[in-house]
Amino acid sequence: MKHIPRKRFGQHFLADQAIIDAIVRAIAPAPGQPMVEIGPGLAALTQPLVERLGRLTVVELDRDLAQRLRSHGQLDVIESDVLKVDFSAVAANLGAPRIRIVGNLPYNISTPILFHLLEHVGVVEDQHFMLQKEVIDRMVAQPATSDYGRLSVMLQWRYAMEDVLFVPPESFDPPPRVDSAVVRMVPHAAPAPVAPRLLEELVQVAFSQRRKLLRHTLGRWLEARQFTGTFDTQRRAEEVPVADYVALAQACA
């Protein structure tokens, strides 16, 4: 029986074989590698991956799809909301110090998923995700551009990222109303040591009114923390490089 895509799960199933082949080439799975796929759906990407890996763990929220996937002898199915999955525990269960994570992420919750995975980055080898193109543009954006923001800073602090493949709407069933792309995310081997929650709070305050000078937002936040160091608040949030935000968070710790 044909599965009807569910809007509440943000389901858009990949159906273009040429795009699927290109994604698999970008991921380059090798036999025996511990890999987790988020949102396998109708297994368009799952099947070519598991053929190369031998075994694959998948996270699927849709009960009907999870039931279908369980009939595949080479898949280990976690039926769950991805935001509730402890990826560190998944890695431990696989006996792997690091896991590779891939997926066609639901566009309606892609940013929360990225922040959730940030909490488990210590067990991540790399990540390849299909996302809304405009989200990837924000992820890889440079300072002094309109796309540069909280997502750019938080993810660039922890990952090296690149946009590896453009995916048009007609590659999906049903077609989304937006362009898509695939991003590769590789954790930095030695990221600057900083408390993630502190950096996130600092960056959120900075970008809360991005058109204003930082003295009106971050300046007041720093005053409240009785910060005595030096930081140029005569700039707008989008003009401050990632390294400066990280250094400020370190100074505030």
UniProtKB/Swiss-Prot annotation:
Cellular component per GO, a single term: cytosol
Annotated catalysed reactions: adenosine(1518)/adenosine(1519) in 16S rRNA + 4 S-adenosyl-L-methionine = N(6)-dimethyladenosine(1518)/N(6)-dimethyladenosine(1519) in 16S rRNA + 4 S-adenosyl-L-homocysteine + 4 H(+)
Amino acids binding S-adenosyl-L-methionine: 12, 14, 39, 60, 81, 104
One Gene Ontology term of the molecular function aspect: RNA binding
Pfam families named in the record: RrnaAD
Entry's EC annotation: 2.1.1.182
Annotated SUPFAM superfamilies: S-adenosyl-L-methionine-dependent methyltransferases (SSF53335)
UniProt main location, coarse: cytoplasm
Role description: Specifically dimethylates two adjacent adenosines (A1518 and A1519) in the loop of a conserved hairpin near the 3'-end of 16S rRNA in the 30S particle. May play a critical role in biogenesis of 30S subunits.
Name this polypeptide is given: Ribosomal RNA small subunit methyltransferase A
Organism: Paracidovorax citrulli (strain AAC00-1)
Native organism taxonomy: Bacteria, Pseudomonadati, Pseudomonadota, Betaproteobacteria, Burkholderiales
Gene giving rise to this polypeptide: rsmA
